[in-house]
């Protein structure tokens, strides 16, 4: 117990003890006289001042539920029952707040009435609330929390009413597209809300507006980051069957063909690139932030539906190569293949390695070409007189078109050089033949007599002189001399 008479009440309770159980008429009279003199409140002082052997809580409940003057007794009237049902539909089990709306009725009485009524109607299989109270309760709940399951998306009307919903915008009117998106999605993004007129009218079905079924999401690129992809498009929130029609790459190609002529003057020079970079492309659609929190994978385009480069509509490259647009609507990959073939025919990618699997073969052919060019230069400089005997060969290798020897006729070139080279009258020694046989395994090794021999004015080739040595094998010394005198290739 607490209050002013805590010590006295404790001593009294220890000596005589507090009484429990039903109240008697004498106890009711003592409590009524005390409240008439001292008023309501400070119930713990009742025992000290009146000598009533009851605790403060028991006195308060006895006064509020049985002894107060304005207390109503008996069963609830039909009007009171209707008020209790309405209040319970709005407030729930707030018995004290409900009692404040019913003068003369206590919270305990209201609770007992409701529990008894609920059990009785459940046993009878009747609804807890009347029909009109149920509709009103649903409308009131919609004001606080909107049930997302009430949205009924009409998928069957999607293709009929929203076939032309995709909107292409150029980079020049990016601000206008942003403003149109803001106006179309002006509803709060934190929670989808129904029309307030629908939620407040109990006779209307709370079906949202048709604009709620199709929220527009804008995907656009930053024009400062990539000027080759200066277009944007909007995708409606739709089913999977209609999304394939909306994201048709043929529409994107048509739009690019119409708007790419204005951007041809701003193109940069195309540098030498590999076929893999041309096919893969350096152009990707960067999705903007979605206001409703959708996942990026929902609106991500497939790999075969990504837009192509801005030069896909037959631009003119610096060297005069025309890139024709794809003849059919087979897809963007075919268009890129045709463009790469056109560029390769125009000579832009003449020296580009096709794939990593052919890298070794191409490098070997280039080494051959470099060696052959070096051989031609050496013959033109040091063996001019010998080649002068046959002017056809001299003119052949001094033409401007033979600056760089092609790979296809390398075998024919080597054969012609060996056949037209002046023959020597002096027989070659045995060590020369052995050395030549040892070096036949390397396809890079030229005829050893050409590079190692001393070219004279009469066209004779003399083998190099080897200093005599008794302790070193002449074959080993000749082999090391041969490889040390090899000219540098790269």
UniProtKB/Swiss-Prot annotation:
InterPro entries in the cross-refs: Homeodomain-like_sf, Myb_dom, SANT/Myb
Major subcellular site: nucleus
Cellular compartments annotated: Nucleus
Compositionally biased tracts (Low complexity): 169-186
Residue ranges of every copy of the HTH myb-type domain listed in the record: 15-67, 68-122
Tissue expression profile of the protein: Present mostly in flowers, siliques and floral shoot tips. Expression is restricted to the subapical pith cells of both vegetative and flowering plants and to the hypocotyl hook. Expressed in pollen grains and pollen tube. Mostly expressed in mature pollen grains, and, to a lower extent, in inflorescences and siliques.
Name of the protein this chain belongs to: Transcription factor MYB101
Organism expressing this protein natively: Arabidopsis thaliana (Mouse-ear cress)
